[in-house]
Structures are given as C-alpha cells and as structure tokens.
Design a protein with these regions (language model features):
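Domain-terminus/edge residues, biased toward the C-terminal soluble/receptor-binding domains
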Residues: 23, 27, 35-162, 167-170, ...
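Short, charged, amphipathic alpha-helices and their helix-cap/turn boundaries
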Residues: 8-27
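LysM (lysin motif) carbohydrate-binding repeats in extracellular/periplasmic proteins that recognize
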Residues: 176-179
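Conserved short loop/turn motifs at secondary-structure junctions
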Residues: 2-3, 32-36
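Alpha-helical scaffold elements that line and support the substrate/ligand-binding pocket
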Residues: 1-14, 46-49, 117
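Substrate-binding clefts and substrate-entry loops adjacent to catalytic sites
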Residues: 1, 26-29
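Short acidic/histidine-centered micro-motifs embedded in hydrophobic/aromatic stretches
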Residues: 1-2, 17, 63-66
Length: 179
C-alpha cells in the first residue's frame, strides 16, 4: 500500500510520478482509469509511462504480457489480441472510454529494438489493433528489422538508442482527432 488507503491519495501519488516522468498533459483522478471528467492524458504521456514501466519495473512488467491468469479460482484472459499475434509482442494495456474510443499501449521487441506504440480513437478493438499493427510494421520495416509482412526493403538510418515510441492520436477526445 503506497497511499493512505484512499483513491484520492493514490491519484495524488500517481500525479507526482507523472510529473517526474514529464507527463505534461496528464491528470489522474482515480486508480482504475475509468471515466472521470477531470482525468485526462495523451498518447505521448502514456508512451512515457509505458517506457518507464518497462525500464524501471522489469520485475513487474512480466505481468503485462500474460495471456491469462487465475485469481480466486477464476481464469482471466487478456483483451490484448495484438499481443497474441504480433512477433516480439510483450504487453502492455488495452482500454476503452466513450470519448476517446478503443485504446492500446503496446510494446514489442525484435533484435534488441523495442517499440512502444500508443493508439487512441479506435472505433473497435479489431480496428485499433489493425491500425497499430500497420504502424508498428512500418516502423520496424524502416529500421530494417523483420516485420509480420514478408516484404523486404533496405533502409539505412542512424540509431542512437534502442527505444522508440510511436504516438498516434494525441487528443483528449476522439472527435478532435478526426478533424
């Protein structure tokens, strides 16, 4: 327990951590991520949080790639269908809120190159997964790494580190992203 036991206190701690990560457009109001008019974030900020999770908490990150787990006698299965079908996938989190549609924070690692993709605004979970898969494949292709497609092309780029982030739809509301 890292708070005084209240959700408000927990959200305060989350906001302090978000500030340390330079998540400049995020305000947490609850621990669940369920809708709250005062709670907001961006795809960029979720990418920062995802990167910090992977880097700073590797012992906890293993839980984000589980296909299923058992809790109090009940088996729970992941909603992250892309993770089940994407080469190198190892997590992170799906979501849905009416105002911003189907969302996904996603990570994959191939040949020691990790990509973090964050997608907001999907009309369906399937459409969200398909769109993010296309983007991830494109970036891996540009890095000249294996993709889930069989097409090959040679691209030369200079790489400074092994972490990349893809941010799509950095809008609070889906309707703004479509303008």
């Amino acid at each position: 327990n890292i708070s005084n036991g209240t959700e408000r206190d927990f959200a305060k701690i989350m906001n302090q951590y978000a500030s340390k990560l330079q998540m400049k457009n995020t305000s947490f109001k609850n621990a669940s991520g369920l809708p709250n008019r005062a709670q907001m974030t961006t795809a960029r900020d979720i990418a920062l949080l995802s990167h910090a999770l992977i880097k700073n908490f590797p012992e906890k990150y293993k839980y984000f790639k589980q296909e299923k787990f058992k809790w109090k006698g009940k088996i729970y299965k992941t909603h992250n269908k892309l993770m089940l079908n994407y080469q190198g996938a190892d997590g992170i989190k799906t979501g849905y809120i009416k105002d911003s549609g189907f969302q996904l924070a996603f990570s994959a690692k191939r040949n020691e190159k990790r990509l973090i993709g964050v997608y907001f605004g999907g009309d369906t979970g399937r459409q969200r997964d398909k769109s993010l898969k296309i983007i991830m494949d494109k970036v891996y292709g540009d890095l000249n790494l294996p993709t889930t497609k069989k097409e090959e092309k040679e691209v030369k780029i200079k790489i400074k580190n092994n972490s990349y982030a893809i941010v799509v739809g950095t809008f609070k509301y889906k309707k703004n992203a479509e303008k």
